[in-house]
Amino acid sequence: MLKNLRETMRTAPIVRRGTYNYFIHPISDGVPVVKPELLREVIACMVKNADLDVDKIVTIEAMGLPLGAALSTMTDIPFIIIRKRKYELPGEIAVHQTTGYSRGELYLNGINKGDRVLIIDDVISTGGTMKAVIKALEKAGAVIKDIVVVIERGDGKKSIEELGYDVQTLIKIDVDENGVKILGCIDEECQ
């Protein structure tokens, strides 16, 4: 099922940022080009595996935008974008996030107490962003029904599971200076 995702991961360029081997991929970076067949495949896999008995889909700017829009369109479930910009709307919640290579503020709007939500994102590495998002959703009184992330790298998934939440990832990878190695994926035809 994830033929395009597997192939594009295997051929993803690697750049060095300090001591960090950063992979460049259409799902996580939007470059060089996001092909519709790749996005369609990823969203179809999310539809097949995610708990869609929710009121809202929650995703994180920037690369969560195409995922959220496509999944919302396919399921008719509204989506919320956690933004990098403050809007100062009533009830806005600041989300302080720290990742393996950045930190900053994000802002959550549009969540009501009792909303059942599905969180989706492009990558989980350290889990820093996801922890911050979970904390903000809990503060807003949302019920987190499921978390689905396209690409798993590092121990971030484990750190979220230690908080009591399951995280489904479509593909698990490791990255070194030689490239991306696929360690597993949600479908049976991974390798």
Swiss-Prot record:
It catalyses: IMP + diphosphate = hypoxanthine + 5-phospho-alpha-D-ribose 1-diphosphate; GMP + diphosphate = guanine + 5-phospho-alpha-D-ribose 1-diphosphate. GO terms for cellular component: cytoplasm. InterPro entries: HGPRTase-like (IPR026597), PRibTrfase_dom (IPR000836), PRTase-like (IPR029057), Pur/Pyrimidine_PRTase (IPR050118). GO terms for molecular function: guanine phosphoribosyltransferase activity; hypoxanthine phosphoribosyltransferase activity. Pathway: Purine metabolism; IMP biosynthesis via salvage pathway; IMP from hypoxanthine: step 1/1. It comes from the Archaea. It holds the Pfam family Pribosyltran. Keywords: Cytoplasm, Glycosyltransferase, Purine salvage, Transferase. PROSITE patterns: PUR_PYR_PR_TRANSFER. Transmembrane segments: none annotated. GO terms for biological process: IMP salvage; purine ribonucleoside salvage. Coiled coil: none annotated. Its EC number is 2.4.2.8. It is found in: Cytoplasm. Belongs to the purine/pyrimidine phosphoribosyltransferase family. Archaeal HPRT subfamily. HAMAP family: Hypx_phosphoribosyltr. Catalyzes a salvage reaction resulting in the formation of IMP that is energically less costly than de novo synthesis. Homodimer. This is Hypoxanthine/guanine phosphoribosyltransferase.
